[in-house]
Amino acid sequence: MRVLGIDPGSRITGYGLVEQHGSRLVHLDNGAVFTDKAKDFPDRLRLIFEGLSRVIAEYAPDAVAVEDVYVSENVRAALKLGQARGAAIAAAVHAGLPVFEYTASQVKQAVVGQGRAGKEQVQKMVKALLGLPEIAQADASDAVAVAICHINSYQLRLQAGPAVATSRRASSWRNYRP
């Protein structure tokens, strides 16, 4: 299974591709889509959509996992983050891919084993799990963690059987039709 993980942001949207080979996780690529804050916001959303569409076309993932919006006291920032997530989800749905969403604490739990783990702990574990010396961009590292979270969660759902699969906490946009 090949998964594209996405850490959405209105300025920087990180992405990471991880593939599962048996019990091994293999890092394929990671990076970020950068937008220019001087541009108008709809144009920045277009850049996110187009950038992720290129990544999807190049790597042909089987699924996309997106970090869910966290609660923010800054309503304007939360709305912009939600719109950036929408652009990312639209790119995946446009390509016909299933989309799964995970909260930050679900990602941390799946990667580190603790839902309140710090960013540094997550980055360290991502590097250890994939045998990487470094991941240059923090947003890309977070996106790789989201991909790992989906692979681990997917495997657990398969092992647990249909009862868990129907009551999963991660939501899917697979059946969404505008």
Curated annotation (Swiss-Prot):
Xref: InterPro entries: RNaseH-like_sf, RNaseH_sf, X-over_junc_endoDNase_Mg_BS, X-over_junc_endoDNase_RuvC
Residues that coordinate or bind Mg(2+) 1: 7, 139
Pfam families: RuvC (PF02075)
Catalytic activity, EC: 3.1.21.10
Active-site residue numbers: 7, 67, 139
Catalyses which reaction(s): Endonucleolytic cleavage at a junction such as a reciprocal single-stranded crossover between two homologous DNA duplexes (Holliday junction)
MF term (GO), any: magnesium ion binding
Top EC class, one word: hydrolase
NCBIfam families: PRK00039.2-1 (NF000711), ruvC (TIGR00228)
Family statement drawn from the similarity comment of this UniProt entry: Belongs to the RuvC family.
Role description: The RuvA-RuvB-RuvC complex processes Holliday junction (HJ) DNA during genetic recombination and DNA repair. Endonuclease that resolves HJ intermediates. Cleaves cruciform DNA by making single-stranded nicks across the HJ at symmetrical positions within the homologous arms, yielding a 5'-phosphate and a 3'-hydroxyl group; requires a central core of homology in the junction. The consensus cleavage sequence is 5'-(A/T)TT(C/G)-3'. Cleavage occurs on the 3'-side of the TT dinucleotide at the point of strand exchange.
Protein name, as recorded: Crossover junction endodeoxyribonuclease RuvC
Name of the gene encoding the protein in the UniProt record: ruvC
